[in-house]
A protein has these predicted regions:
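Helix-helix packing/entry segments at the starts of transmembrane helices
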Residues: 38-41, 80, 84, 98-105, ...
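Glycine-/small-residue-enriched transmembrane alpha-helix faces in small-molecule transporters
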Residues: 1-41, 150-177, 197, 201, ...
Length: 311
């Protein structure tokens, strides 16, 4: 199987995991546990997993140098600590529909950050792809009502999600050099440890206050899904893909989440499909294609390469 096919498959699985998480998380919060408590369980669980995995798979691989260590700290703060604290705080207050809409700002941040920090070429095709995919995602979400699932302070929740999307978009850019230089487990163990330093002081009270004995099997399954799939598997696949794809491509796959969320709802009998939504989904896939398509050989000769791996 070609590496490019594996990359797109990994990113699709990540989008599917995140799409389901919007609804699954709302089943747990705030009735069974507060958002900060969930973040603590996710980050601590992932920290233990990636630390053990690093010891087994790459025990002699270490992040060295002042620049790389500072980059790993920034990645842990933005991509793990702030990212997850802001996301679950926002999702606790707003609706899954609003949250998935605002998340589509992340690719825009990623493209701009790539141009500023990595000197990645901001081509017309890439800008057009981001715009087309954003139009498809926005049209899906705006065509649905989001008031029933919102919390008590929807505006504040929307602001938290906006900040979360911004932090994640920048994280994709700054962590990429580390993922291409070190073993993925080395990087993930470090950045989750940094995230845990932020999450433990904030979330330990909510985690300790939860009545775990009252959790039905479905809630335990939801918590396990958020720790194993949303945190460990999704971050592992995302960061592996960064070795072969540009941050802009990873960011653009966020646009798949609203479309996949609709398909999940249809499969569960909670929503219905229409020709309008099918067209909106096609817009999203067209945008992903425009961002990820390789340039022609003639274009490669005229434009300097962006880095060791072309998207």
């Amino acid at each position: 199987m070609k590496t490019s096919v594996k990359v797109h498959a990994a990113l699709f699985v990540v989008s599917l995991i995140y799409a389901a998480n919007y609804s699954i998380s709302k089943d747990v919060m705030p009735r069974y546990m507060g958002p900060f408590g969930l973040v603590l369980l996710r980050i601590v669980g992932a920290t233990l997993f990636f630390t053990i995995a690093h010891r087994l798979a790459a025990p002699h691989d270490r992040i060295i140098g002042r620049g790389d260590n500072l980059r790993s700290i920034a990645s842990g703060v933005l991509g793990i600590g702030l990212n997850q604290l802001l996301f679950f705080s926002g999702l606790n207050l707003t609706s899954p529909i609003n949250a998935s809409l605002i998340q589509t700002i992340a690719p825009i941040v990623t493209v701009l950050a790539s141009a500023l920090l990595l000197s990645e070429k901001l081509t017309l095709r890439r800008v057009l792809g981001v715009g087309v995919a954003g139009l498809g995602a926005a049209s899906i979400i705006l065509s649905r009502s989001s008031t029933e699932a919102a919390g008590s302070n929807e505006l504040l929740g929307d602001i938290y999600i906006l900040l979360n999307a911004t932090a994640f978009g920048i994280y994709l850019v700054i962590v990429m050099p580390l993922m291409r230089k070190y073993h993925p487990f080395t990087v993930l163990a470090r950045i989750f440890l940094v995230g845990a330093v932020l999450a433990v002081p904030v979330g330990w009270q909510q985690a300790a206050a939860a009545d775990y004995a009252s959790f039905p099997p479905g809630i335990w399954a939801a918590v396990a899904y958020m720790v194993l799939c949303v945190t460990i598997l999704a971050y592992l696949l995302n960061n592996w893909a960064l070795k072969y794809a540009s941050p802009a491509l990873l960011g653009t796959y966020i646009y798949l989440q609203p479309a996949l969320a609709v398909l999940i709802a249809v499969g569960l009998g909670k929503d219905h499909m229409s020709w309008e939504r099918a067209g909106q989904g096609l817009l999203i896939f067209l945008g992903v294609f425009l961002v990820s398509r390789k340039p022609k050989p003639s274009q490669l000769a005229a434009v300097p390469p962006l880095g060791p791996v072309q998207d």
